[in-house]
From Swiss-Prot:
It comes from Drosophila simulans (Fruit fly). Its EC number is 5.3.1.23. Gene3D superfamilies: translation initiation factor eif-2b, domain 1, Translation initiation factor eif-2b, domain 2. This is Methylthioribose-1-phosphate isomerase. One of its GO terms (biological process) is L-methionine salvage from methylthioadenosine. GO terms for molecular function: S-methyl-5-thioribose-1-phosphate isomerase activity.
Length: 364
């Protein structure tokens, strides 16, 4: 059974505080938008899909008990609060896309004379709750599509470990499982699907400095699921790919540009370079909501920079020399030329065909 990072019922929202993992499992009550903004910004909840869901649900629990005088005041409340939530962590596109969809819905309901203010509020609440259910379904589809793509490619290349009956070894980076989504996961969902098919020989996860999402969160999930897993340092990836017959790398994404350039957790780019050198296929697993067709390439993606303290301290203990300067981008951009395929809930696409394929899917 996968971990539950988000507990929601109408009017009530709690999130598993990921800053305390793996030492302590504690849920934090989110009472409204201010709480939602803080837990996203402080990374008590993280992962692009989870950020969007928690952000939208924080608004849902805030407006649920309120009585609005008219539809105009409700529409203004929705638009203003959603735009504010987008600012909590701007690199992840999912929150912006979700906000735009809900603002569009609010505007449509506002203009619909047959809908009164109470109906408008309940329609909005229904839409936010539907996002939670859809994310889990999308994750499962991503997992199935990704596992199939990896197994087909590996079988064709003959890269399964000797004596493994078709099972594979994979590497993942950061945390992209149940803790980063509404449930199941994106890249880790692919790993989970491989395990369900009996085709997972081994999974390697990076520590993912400086926030250690791999060591704290992914390792926690892998142990919970009892998957055959090994933690490696970020600096070990080249040695790992050379020595351990890894069949594929699969990572998540915070934003994918229309040309396939992908912003993901810092360190992803160098893993892609190493994978290319060792002829290991490199996959990005992401829902359609992580793909931003409005951005032509990775150079246009805003990269969030985090506080120095995340690099210089572990807990309250300083590990870096006082006075040293730090550069701490939270993400890097992997060029499309290094990406084998982008795994979505609607299929696996080569970066060069991504824009046309997604445009057709959205039109249909």
């Amino acid at each position: 059974m996968s971990l539950q990072s988000i507990k929601y019922s109408r009017g009530s929202l709690e999130i598993l505080d990921q800053l305390l993992l793996p030492g302590q499992s504690k849920y934090v009550v989110v009472r409204g938008v201010e709480d939602g903004w803080k837990v996203i910004n402080k990374m008590q909840v993280r992962g692009a899909p989870a950020i969007a869901i928690v952000g939208c649900l924080s608004l849902a629990v805030e407006i649920n008990p309120e009585d609005f005088e008219n539809k105009k005041s409700l529409r203004q409340e929705i638009e203003g609060k959603l735009n504010y939530l987008v600012s909590a962590r701007p690199t992840a596109v999912n929150m912006k896309i979700a906000a735009d969809e809900l603002i569009t819905l609010a505007n449509e309901l506002y203009k619909d004379e047959a809908t009164d203010v109470t109906q408008m509020k309940h329609r909005f609440l229904d839409a936010t709750e539907a996002m939670l259910k859809k994310d889990i379904a999308d994750n499962r589809a991503i997992g199935a599509n990704g596992a199939q793509a990896i197994l087909q490619r590996v079988a064709k290349a003959g890269k399964t470990p000797a004596g493994s009956t078709g099972s594979v070894r994979v590497l993942t980076h950061c945390n992209t499982g149940s803790l980063a989504t509404a449930g199941y996961g994106t890249a880790l969902g692919v790993v989970r699907q491989l395990a369900e098919l009996g085709k997972l020989e081994h999974v390697y996860c990076t520590e993912t400095r400086p926030y250690n999402q791999g060591a704290r969160l992914t390792a926690y999930e892998l142990v919970h699921e009892k998957f055959p897993a090994t933690l490696v340092l970020d600096s070990m990836v080249a040695a790992l790919l050379r020595a351990k017959n890894v069949a594929a790398v699969v990572v998540g994404a915070d934003r994918v540009a229309s040309n396939g350039d992908t912003a993901n957790k810092i360190g992803t780019y160098q893993i892609a370079v190493v994978a290319k050198h060792h002829d290991v296929p490199f996959y990005v697993a992401a829902p359609l909501t992580s793909i931003d067709l409005a951005i032509p390439g990775g150079d246009h993606i805003i990269i969030e920079e985090r506080p120095d303290r995340e690099m210089t301290h572990v807990g309250e203990h300083r590990i870096a020399a006082p006075g040293i300067n730090c550069w701490n981008p939270a993400f890097d951009v992997t060029p499309a030329s290094l990406i084998t395929g982008i795994i979505t809930e609607r299929g696996v696409f080569k970066p060069a065909e991504l824009k046309e394929a997604i445009t057709k899917l959205l039109e249909s």
